[in-house]
Amino acid sequence: DSEFAELKIRGKIFKLPILKASIGEDVIDISRVSAEADCFTYDPGFMSTASCQSTITYIDGDKGILRHRGYDIKDLAEKSDFLEVAYLLIYGELPSGEQYNNFTKQVAHHSLVNERLHYLFQTFCSSSHPMAIMLAAVGSLSAFYPDLLNFKEADYELTAIRMIAKIPTIAAMSYKYSIGQPFIYPDNSLDFTENFLHMMFATPCTKYTVNPIIKNALNKIFILHADHEQNASTSTVRIAGSSGANPFACISTGIASLWGPAHGGANEAVINMLKEIGSSEYIPKYIAKAKDKNDPFRLMGFGHRVYKNYDPRAAVLKETCKEVLKELGQLDNNPLLQIAIELEAIALKDEYFIERKLYPNVDFYSGIIYKAMGIPSQMFTVLFAIARTVGWMAQWKEMHEDPEQKISRPR
């Protein structure tokens, strides 16, 4: 039987349908309020508003749960590879062996970008941020696929594969251009993560051998960042896509949103904070500064809009960080890791942070891993974009397959 919530406005009662969720909180359907009650709902930042129905990702922030298509994120990070998770997000189920092989072959086949795109990079000054370069390059793919202004359902999967395949190539090209090195072409004998590391660190005169521990760590990082419900960048992609815009242009809007320091740039801020603290002996001083409302200092890497418990992604990354530093001989002498571990231990015992449910989030350890890998801080958000492109394309595809889809138009 249908359930309803009652809304009383100026003495008149309106019955609002309660939509049952397959898991998690139920939802009150307010779509008819403006037409029937002659008023709108007001919810800055969409704190309590669902903008769509989705079966891709589920989060229970109070319990620290993150699932993709029903699979726990920790299981996926430990037992899957990134393209297997990409297939899961896009198609709704894990691939068979044959499906996985076909999918990875298609991704490899589309990893090259048009040679004319190389000229675009030459228009940027040498000091340009890699995110600025990547944003422009991804948006320019719209010019190479102009027919996608009139895309059909048959185009959804190929478009997703093309975007997933080309984003690491463009990301590596953005980095190479920013440091004045020649572009390295994809090597389809390597898997997705190996190929990206190869394009990042190889040169025409120096062969780069991928360390398997580094590869596995980056694979986990990509999986952990693949999707996260209707966050700022995902919502941006959906809003742009709702107008029927070219999908490559839609992804470029997601990259722009992700670039913001409150979204994708937080792990770089964590590194800067740990450097500012400088030594474990100064942690109490900075804890006090974080509690002081009049002090501009903020404890980065703690707290999350959704999670009111330990971010499950942070738990995986903490152990991954230790594995990487042990492999590189830095486990016992990496000052940033030592500060991070002690800062976390002190904060988790402090009533101020406990009462406010401020726990380490996914950004707290990822920057330390990137830095140990030799990835510069200006590339941190670029790597986030590589991973999140999978989620963006899955959400974009789901949106266009939704019969209730309308152009987004907030009031």
From Swiss-Prot:
Pathways involved: Carbohydrate metabolism; tricarboxylic acid cycle; isocitrate from oxaloacetate: step 1/2
Enzyme active site: 304, 363
SUPFAM superfamilies in the record: Citrate synthase
Top EC group: transferase
Catalytic activity entry: oxaloacetate + acetyl-CoA + H2O = citrate + CoA + H(+)
Record keywords, A-Z: Transferase, Tricarboxylic acid cycle
GO cellular component assignments: cytoplasm
BP terms from Gene Ontology: tricarboxylic acid cycle
Classification via InterPro entries: Citrate_synth-like_lrg_a-sub, Citrate_synth-like_sm_a-sub, Citrate_synthase, Citrate_synthase_AS, Citrate_synthase_bac-typ, Citrate_synthase_sf, Citrate_synthase_typ-I
The protein's Enzyme Commission number: 2.3.3.16
Other observations noted: Citrate synthase is found in nearly all cells capable of oxidative metabolism.
Family: Belongs to the citrate synthase family.
Name of the molecule in the record: Citrate synthase
Name of the gene encoding the protein in the UniProt record: gltA
